[in-house]
Amino acid sequence: ADDIKKMMDEKKMITSAAGNMEFQYSETAGNENPKYGILAKYTGGINTMFFAHNNVFKPMEKYADSRIPRYFDPGHDGVFRALDTRQDAEDDEDGNIYSSAISSYLYRKDCPDVLYSYQEQLLLESEVYARGIGVTKDLAKANELFQAGVQAACNYYKADTEATKTFLSKLPDLSKLSESEALYEIHMQQWIDLMDRPLEAFV
């Protein structure tokens, strides 16, 4: 708690998306994102291997998350639908796939690998205030940081502006929740933000 208090007091942490730490890739041959490279090598650049999972999609769908079309590509009929563990992708006799694949946007050649982001910082600070670690517990402050963190995440993925406004308006007000309920909402947004970074999401 003392170390966290010191960090919060010193205010030397990143304060905008300009401080994001990323490993950069490019469209130059040999320097593409490895996730793109897997698809280019094995499936002709079309993602028929990696699909949306309900453990991320359902919490996003609950609040009409504006990142859905940035995270996932719709099925052949234009509908977003995810899979459960070990569930096969849904297709038809013509080979059209109806399950939502992880988006070509996330698997583009020059998609950077995020090491640490502004939205992570804000959501962690939100958790600090919700728990009262090194600071006075303050769910109103936690909610302010929560909203800012989710907004920053939507901005990072270039989600639609109007859809993001609607999404943010649907999120619960943490100040009206119990501590455990507030922490659940914060953790769920951390989980969603780390969807493309599974090691961090599980730590």
Give the role of each language-model region:
Residues 4-125, 130-131, 137-193, 198-199:
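Hydrophobic-face positions in mid-chain alpha helices that act as interaction patches
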